[in-house]
Amino acid sequence: MAGNNFTEVTVFILSGFANHPELQVSLFLMFLFIYLFTVLGNLGLITLIRMDSQLHTPMYFFLSNLAFIDIFYSSTVTPKALVNFQSNRRSISFVGCFVQMYFFVGLVCCECFLLGSMAYNRYIAICNPLLYSVVMSQKVSNWLGVMPYVIGFTSSLISVWVISSLAFCDSSINHFFCDTTALLALSCVDTFGTEMVSFVLAGFTLLSSLLIITVTYIIIISAILRIQSAAGRQKAFSTCASHLMAVTIFYGSLIFTYLQPDNTSSLTQAQVASVFYTIVIPMLNPLIYSLRNKDVKNALLRVIHRKLFP
């Protein structure tokens, strides 16, 4: 991949946050706590959905996929960051760097389109409830669950291929993981074409999935406003409030970080935003989708009751 490099780079140094040695212990503890909470919270949600038959619906099928993605896209970055906080080397191999980038970018893209699938599911449930079981069949649900992975990892493969083909003059990545913008800054050659490819792919992923979600919610909100009773409107809105909150947080942080082709944001801002969507959002998702969800709470009570009183 690096055959055209002026200097053969075999190892990168992840120097993000290295200029704040007084924060290394605090950052290590914060990352560790959030990562453990993320893994346990999302694994718990997946396990609960599998154990309770009343949650075997398309909505919770998508939610278990979201939890799976959150575990693994956090795991592509956080464990290596934890090691680096306790190490003086902070190194990652050339291949390891692009493998990390491939899975991270791919899983983030997967989450974008999976959130779109979840929005479509809410649209059918609210706007066409009588046809829900017909429209959201097992085949359709599986298709809506698989396609985000296909699109996400295809997009990621293209992005990683064009960036890994660049010539790199430096091996010090000013970030805590192999981020696309930080790697582009190390190139010896003109990166305009590569930046445009990355920008178009990011724009397609973010804007196309966000367009699907936006149009879907315009229709949903219009349908909710036509409901006569206040109680009915409240019940309908409560079924999609958690998803809408998760979408707002996730897309807001991604757009702030990546949809800036002129690279006007500082690297410090990018790192702070990256911390948020890399480790914080995967932790928040199980809380957002479970604390306000009566079905999940009731399922947890049923599982506990079965275990205590078999």
Curated annotation (Swiss-Prot):
Subcellular location(s) per record: Cell membrane
Carbohydrate-modified residues: 5
Cited Gene3D superfamilies: Rhodopsin 7-helix transmembrane proteins
BP term (GO), one: G protein-coupled receptor signaling pathway
Membrane-related topology note: Multi-pass membrane protein
Pfam families tied to this protein: 7tm_4
GO molecular function annotation: G protein-coupled receptor activity; odorant binding; olfactory receptor activity
Covalent S-S links between cysteines: 97-188
Role summary: Odorant receptor.
Protein name as catalogued: Olfactory receptor 8I2
Record organism: Homo sapiens (Human)
Lineage: Eukaryota, Metazoa, Chordata, Craniata, Vertebrata
Name of the coding gene: OR8I2
